[in-house]
């Protein structure tokens, strides 16, 4: 695939993924976890995605080039009590190395925003590693703004 980063890559399709896509999604999800310094474990990747899809706890968007899976986004729904609206958390975004720089991430992000709007959400939130400057540049180029009002905490259980 050869395409300028700002051009729409040819033959890229972004669609909703289902349980029948697990064999294509699981290797991408495993590679995503490895990127974030988790050990490769295809069985864990497949089981995690299967449970999310089976229980309808997330929405997965799959990008394909000429029928081959090359990226995904996973969205989780939640609600903003303050705004009294639905919100979506863009928790996972991954594009295979062979498809990077061709606009696949932009297409996935656009489809995620389209999904959020279609479900009446007031916003689409995401987080990324402090050192992931490439992703940060993408998000900022799409109009995402760094939250300077709230500080987020977590508790390991």
Q: Which residues does each PLM region occupy?
A:
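Conserved beta-strand-loop-alpha-helix junction that forms the acyl-donor binding cleft
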Residues: 100, 122-135, 154-157
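Conserved beta-strand in the GNAT
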Residues: 62, 68-77
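Conserved GNAT acetyl-CoA-binding A-motif
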Residues: 109, 116-127
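Helix-loop element at the rim of GNAT/NAT acetyltransferase active sites that forms part
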Residues: 27-40
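A short beta-loop-alpha structural element at the N-terminal edge
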Residues: 13-27
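Conserved acetyl-CoA-binding loop-helix of GNAT-fold acetyltransferases
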Residues: 95, 101-114, 137, 141
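Conserved active-site alpha-helix within GNAT-family acetyltransferase domains
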Residues: 106, 130-149
């Amino acid at each position: 695939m050869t395409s300028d980063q700002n051009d729409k890559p040819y033959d890229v399709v972004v669609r909703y993924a289902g349980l029948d896509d697990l064999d294509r999604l699981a290797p991408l999800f495993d590679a995503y976890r490895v990127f974030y310094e988790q050990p490769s474990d295809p069985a864990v990747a497949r089981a995690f995605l299967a449970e999310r899809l089976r229980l309808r706890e997330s929405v997965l968007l799959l990008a394909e080039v000429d029928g081959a899976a090359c990226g995904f986004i996973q969205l989780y729904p939640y609600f903003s009590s303050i705004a009294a609206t639905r919100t979506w958390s863009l928790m996972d975004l991954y594009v295979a190395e062979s498809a990077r720089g061709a606009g696949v991430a932009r297409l996935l992000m656009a489809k995620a925003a389209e999904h959020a709007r279609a479900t009446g959400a007031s916003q689409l939130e995401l987080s990324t590693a402090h050192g992931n400057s490439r992703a940060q540049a993408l998000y900022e180029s799409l109009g995402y703004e760094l939250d300077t009002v709230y500080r987020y905490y977590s508790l390991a259980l």
